[in-house]
Amino acid sequence: MKDLETIILPVLEMSCAVCANNVENTVKVLPGVEEASVNFAANTLSVKYHPSLITPQKMREAVQEAGYDLVVEVEDPTAVQEEMAREHYRKLRRNTIGAWVLSIPLALLGMVFMHTPGGNWIMMALALVIMIVFGRSFYVNGVRHALHGSANMDTLVALSTSIAFLFSFFNTVYPRFWYEKGLEPHVYYEASGVIIAFVLLGKLLEERAKNSTSSAIKSLMGLQPKTARRVRDGQEEEVSISFLRVGDLVSVRPGEKIPVDGTVSQGSSSVDESMLSGEPIPVVKSQGDRVLAGTINQKGAFLMEATGVGSATVLSQIVQMVQAAQGSKAPVQRIVDKISGIFVPIVVGLAILTFIVWLVVGGSGYFSYALLSAVSVLVIACPCALGLATPTALMVGMGKGAEHHILIKDAFALENLCKVDTVVLDKTGTLTEGVPEVTDSFWISEASRDMLDILYTAEMKSEHPLASAILSWLKGTEAAEIDADSFESVTGRGIQMQVHGVTYWVGSKGFLETFKAMVPPEAGREIIRWEEDGKSIVYYGWESELLAVMAISDRLKPTSGEAVEALKEMGIEVHLLTGDGKRTAETVAAMLDIRHYKADVLPSDKEEYIRSLQAAGKKVAMVGDGINDSQALARADVSIAMGKGTDIAMDVAMVTLITSDLMLLPDAIRLSKRTVRSIHQNLFWAFIYNLIGIPLAAGVLFPVNGLLLNPMLASAAMAFSSVSVVLNSLRLKWSKL
């Protein structure tokens, strides 16, 4: 069976959180679907599925049967969704304006000029136009959901306004019914019209605010140009980037954005990669160098060969990761989804109960109060505020992170990150620049050409970061690669190689001890001096004899000290792990004011160290560059990988810091705390709003002070409850990290 695939599809026709639940539950039960998650704030469906068992088109058919729709089998579904969203917003704005233009005179007739001749008939006509022309979608959607055995916010609006209108219509056509009972026949046409006007206004403001929550994704997608100049048979032709294929030649001129990932095949230039890497200095590119989509060519013109197009570009992968993260669900959202699923039926039940209680307590004389209270209960209840509480905060938080070169994998990672109280830092590539260089060497005896050739060959076969430093150092010695009998890399220790039956080795002090090689006193004194300067020591020998010792320096990043201090100010305990010797570890720890450190650690030691911290009740984040860190990253509560924009280890860690700036680490933790706090605030206010609003609408205060909530005010409260949740989430966007 083919491996699982993940696809993100735009969803159409959703109006509230209940709709999102309906779509999600519809897709979840389809054969071949492993996971399905709907983000109401983004109007997207994320599905993990088996392509051999089900296709996106089959998913669409199932969703259509449930009364909704998906955008599939188009070249750019996101662009289609954006265009549909723009059209939806324009239509919503027209309906809102139209509803208010008629609702204002309707409200004046109903509340100020009540005794206007023929006033009831005029109000009935105005209300009918508002309902049929501008509020039509509420009734269409409400009926559609009823036919599918479900209910949503549209159901509540359709029910409440229809009840108010039909009651008023009856009283207009047949007022004698109430006169015969000695009662005044009241009409509430203004309630029908103004409720729709307020709900439309709320949805308009909500849509506008929701669009702001996705601005980060839009700005990322906007980095990539829409067209490119493809070169064929020496001729340039401007084509959509969707037509580019791997292997195509593309011409890039000064000042243009690079359209796809590729390698320079002719010419040279300097490229601004700051939008991906965060590095402000342009990078010189010449033949054979890699260039990335979305980066800006500055001075020269060049030809490039496309190596990554469409969804295979680094920029697209970042966008996909952020979209997936925004669509993920925090653990608390699962509870909210269950509540949203039964919310509307419960509200309808409460409205019926309210109506019955009023009639039982007050009799037929309280019929109008009973009706108004039931309508208010239907109107004031808002599943949207609950449904928007978590996803809007996640969208803004994840988007802000992406804008600041922080990629958070999902809501689970975000929630765990905010709980971290201990950070474990790997030295090489995390605290240091990751650009090591040999600064000193000590040969026990004079270096022969054979010794240099064997060392060069060993390092050529090694993938360790320090190997590149030794190779660069050997370039000036004319050392050359030779044939070796065998080669073995020993994780955490070094490499050993057989040449003509003799074992040569290069590595750490642990390797030195494994081969029981002795360090001469004069070499030992040099080693102590180098370690006190914070340098890494590499030993080179054959069998049990030491041949040479090299000191390798990897400068600390300018922001490492500031980042460590920022973490400590946040109350986070900082630990340093390194494979270097004790003196080197002590020196680096002292330079950065890190109290907890451990030297001479192997990859397995890192995992055990984190396990011991967790056993002591710590919530641990491990920060590394992905090299020799995989076990420790997997063990940590939160794994954080350092990247450089062009080489993002997105599959390695829960959090990826795209640039090499360690200050992103405290920024990421601050962002997680603020996002989670925003989620909790949103949920608190959404629940409190409904817990207080529904009893008020039912008339619980009427026996105390005669207060009865007008349905129009109830609709205004409902409209602005969801808007307030989105606005609270947007505070994240405007805050500084």
Give the role of each language-model region.
Residues 91-227, 338, 441, 709:
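Transmembrane helix-loop-helix hairpins at the membrane interface
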Residues 4, 408, 499-501, 542-681:
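Conserved ATP-binding TGD loop and adjacent catalytic N/P-domain core of P-type ATPases
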Residues 31-53, 57, 189, 218-312, ...:
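Conserved cytosolic catalytic loops of P-type ATPases
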Residues 103, 466, 475-587, 602:
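Signature of the cytosolic headpiece of P-type E1-E2 ATPases
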Residues 276, 372, 382-458, 613, ...:
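Conserved catalytic phosphorylation-site environment of P-type ATPases
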